[in-house]
Design a protein with these regions (language model features):
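C-terminal TM-helix exit segments that contain a strictly Trp-centered aromatic cap at the helix terminus
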Residues: 14-24, 53-60, 94-97
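Hydrophobic alpha-helical membrane segments
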Residues: 77-93
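Interfacial loop at the N-terminal end of multi-pass membrane proteins
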Residues: 3, 21-48, 66
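Core segments of transmembrane alpha-helices
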Residues: 46-57, 87-88, 111
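Loop-to-transmembrane helix junctions at the membrane interface
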Residues: 65-81
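Alpha-helical transmembrane segments of integral membrane proteins, especially early/N-terminal helices
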Residues: 2-18, 107, 111-117
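Membrane-water interface at the C-terminal end of transmembrane alpha helices
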Residues: 113-130
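Membrane-helix boundary connector in multi-pass membrane proteins
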Residues: 91-106
Length: 139
């Protein structure tokens, strides 16, 4: 369930990036609200971010055992760990540094919710692997 919600949040963020790449006036939600419409030079970046967020969503689905392919388990776990760190950094910037109210309250809330859910997912799924001092009973 947590993996599915995290994947949906990444899909939503990916759709936002796709709409920005297509030229819709949604720029208030990203980059501190500097642009209403994404400039032509940034649109390939928006498209790349769409693909990246789509890939992250697939990794969450794989990590949560909701998909069997296209990623290996180890790859999905690595992507989820890196994505969680990225969400934490993005949440700090979105909530405390940005000057855009849209980014602070909409995008910041989404990234914070996704970060907390992602941390809960990692804790629930890998809690025994997070403690490096744990001794295996098969010693």
């Amino acid at each position: 369930m947590l993996a599915a919600v995290c994947a949906v949040l990444f899909f939503v963020n990916g759709v936002l990036q796709l709409l920005l790449a297509l030229g819709l006036p949604l720029g208030r939600f990203v980059l501190g609200g500097a642009y209403t419409v994404s400039p032509l030079l940034l649109r390939p970046v928006n498209l790349a971010l769409f693909l990246a967020w789509f890939g992250c969503a697939l990794a969450y689905l794989r990590y949560g055992s909701l998909l069997r392919r296209p990623l290996r388990e180890r790859t999905a776990r690595s992507i989820v760990y890196v994505s969680t760190l990225w969400l934490f950094i993005a949440s700090v910037f979105n909530l405390f540094i940005t000057t855009s109210d849209f980014e602070r309250y909409v995008t910041g809330t989404l990234s914070t919710v996704a970060c907390v859910l992602s941390m809960c997912l990692i804790w629930r799924r890998d809690r025994f692997q997070l403690c490096p001092c744990r001794i295996s009973p098969h010693r």
